[in-house]
Amino acid sequence: MKRWLSRLVAAVLLVAACPAPSPAAPGAPVVRTVGDPRAADRIVVLVPGVGTTPENIDRGHGGVRRRSPHWQARQLHTACGGQVAVVAWLGYAPPGGVDLAAVRSERAVAGATALTGYVRQLAAARPDATITVIGHSYGSLVLAYAAARLPVQVADLVVLGSPGLDVGAAEQLDTEARLWVGSAEDDWTRRIPEVRILGLGHGADPGQPSFGARNLDVTGAVGHDGYFLPGTTSLESLAAVALGAS
């Protein structure tokens, strides 16, 4: 009972600290492709999170290059030796910041439907390809809601800097794909309360051993948005998964 009350208090405080959510207006999907997914044997789809917009998908949120999904796609493509086509996909409206929209799941649910449709199109165009989907930040929640509906060509799901997946264990995602979790030691999402009450918060930390996911070595990653930095074990680990390592 004491634990439940502490979680309730945490949820109430979290909501009290957040402004009202801004309206979602995803518009047309914005996609950046590095390599040719129509010809590649392996394809990666990157799903970005909080603060990503069509205007900053190339330059990065706040003008910070490592936050750019397009830049991240280029780093992963290079780390894979050019053997993998990498797509930065922005087909939903991420929360603009750590606000009420970010602690709720409506945008992730809507985004999951769009993501599922996009990945199915990729699989239909290239049925023999192996696909990996990587969700960063709130994008990991989009991935979680899409997991059970993704095509069989999706062999691996990777979540980075996740605020939670709205489930208590990996098996609840109802997918045959392998689930990998990476979280940098100084990623602020590690401090998020493991709360999901009245539709607020995203629940258990998927990086905990009890969750049942595979641990991804992200040594060298910096903060919440440094998972694709060149020369890091983190980027090497992502490339290994994309190339089919077990």
Identify the residue ranges that each predicted region occupies.
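Short alpha-helical segments and helix-capping/turn motifs at coil-helix boundaries
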Residues: 27-32, 60-62
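Short, hydrophobic alpha-helix immediately C-terminal to the catalytic nucleophile
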Residues: 144-148
